[in-house]
Amino acid sequence: DGSGTVAMLEIAQAFKQASKKGKGPKRSIVFLHVTGEEKGLLGSAYYADNPIYPLENTVTNLNLDMIGRIDPTRKGDKREYIYIIGSDHDSQDLHNLSEQTNLETVNLDLDYRYNAKDDPNRFYYRSDHYNFAKNGIPIIFYFSGTHPDYHLPSDTPDKIEYDLLELRSKLVFYTAWNIANRDERIKVDPKPEVKKFEVDKDILDGYAGNYGAEGIPLKIGVFIRDNNLFIEVMSQAVQLDALADDVFGSEAMGLKITFDTENGTMEFKQGPYNIKLKRE
């Protein structure tokens, strides 16, 4: 519905007006409008690989993706809300700043119902902030939820709740303002070191090929690129992480794949789906 785009433009204009009055932010701000999200977060992935400023100097990513409608469960006297996803995943400091900023400004109901990484909707992994989060950059994903017009031509501007779009845009502006003007950068929470499971290249070669299942129109290609294992499903390539011997997965996609090279099969698990495929 373009709500995130127009909000970003308004926020950029507000920062520019402040800068002209000599009140510009202490930190640089990149207003990033990316495309290809539905094809696999392509635009944000490209930026993460080719950033304007080094990722290690990137303090925070604030992602506005659908902030102009009302979730059917939040109508009536519960309409002044925004779903917050990811604010506490990598930085309690960012989460606290977000909460305090909201209390001191628009005072929306910050709803965390979709915040868990294992939420079955997997919203945390499905929008462009994820390409920053997976690089260790704290993020906040602002989201008003799905609705009957989700991804349909019927999602037209007349259905936008403009008063809520304004409040939500102000919240993001004030949050960005506080982050950009504080003396210290947002603190990232320490993470326990996870040892990566390594697999030799010759073993990876044994998994490569095209897999299919009888009676199911599902084809999965498995290939190696830069000593990493990938699968291709519906023209989308997904890199897999080695989890154990013959076991690979993708946290972002909620995938787990187990290979049986002796029988030339793979077991594909994603959510409620568990499919056995054979190499063709």
Predicted regions and their residues:
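Alpha-helical metal-binding/catalytic segments enriched in His/Glu/Asp
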Residues: 1-41, 172
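Soluble non-cytosolic domains of exported or imported proteins
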Residues: 2-6, 38-42, 88-93, 126, ...
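His/Asp/Glu-rich mid-to-C-terminal helical/loop segments that flank catalytic regions of hydrolases
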Residues: 6, 13, 143, 147-191
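Solvent-exposed, polar/charged alpha-helical surfaces in well-ordered, non-transmembrane soluble domains
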Residues: 6-13, 17, 45, 96, ...
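Sec-exported extracytoplasmic/periplasmic mature domains
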Residues: 10-20, 49-53, 99-107, 134-137, ...
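Acidic/histidine-enriched alpha-helical segments
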Residues: 21-32, 61-69, 182-198
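Metal-dependent peptidase/peptidase-like ectodomains
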Residues: 34-141
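Peripheral terminal and inter-domain segments
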Residues: 190-280
